[in-house]
C-alpha cells in the first residue's frame, strides 16, 4: 500500500444565475505541478484573508477580545476552523452562553466559510487535470439542493471534465 496526493477545494459553479458552493476532490496529482501549486497558494491566501475578516469582525463588533486570545490562532495554517476561535473563548473562560452563541452564529452564518475563498470550478478541474490528477465531486447530496439541482450540477460538471462522484457521505 502507498499514499497518493489528495486535496479538497472549496469552489463554486453557476446554476440558473445562482452561485452554488461545491467541494472538489483531487487525487493522485503531481505535487510539484506549478499550476496546482499556484492554485493551492491562492486558496491558502484567500482562506487566511477570510479568517482575518472573521476575527476582526468578532473582535470589533461582537466581543472585546484581547489580542493574546487571537494570537493563539495560527493564521498561517492551511486549514483553520471556527472551533479554534471557540477554543480561544473557552480558554479565556467566557460563559457557555457566549460560547453557544458563537457556535450557533458560525453554524447558521458560515461567516468564515463564505464566498471569500471559493474558486471557480473550471479552474479547479483544469489545475487538477494539468497535474495528471483525478477530479471528484465531493458529497453531492450534502449541498441542501433539490434532486433536480444536483442532477443538473452533475451534468454540468461532467461537461466540464470531472472524473467521478463521491457516492457516500456519513452525515447525509
Outline where the language-model segments fall.
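Hydrophobic, aromatic-enriched interface-forming segments
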Residues: 60-117
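A metal-dependent hydrolase metal-coordination microenvironment
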Residues: 1-80, 160, 165-172
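An N-terminally biased module of ancient metal coordination in phosphate/nucleic-acid-related enzymes
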Residues: 1-21, 106-111, 119-172
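Residue-level signal for well-ordered alpha-helical scaffold segments within enzymatic catalytic domains
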Residues: 57-60, 88, 127-130
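Alpha-helix N-cap and loop-to-helix initiation/capping positions
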Residues: 42, 46, 116-119, 145
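Short glycine-/small-residue-rich flexible loop motifs, especially phosphate/cofactor-binding loops
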Residues: 55-56, 86, 125, 154
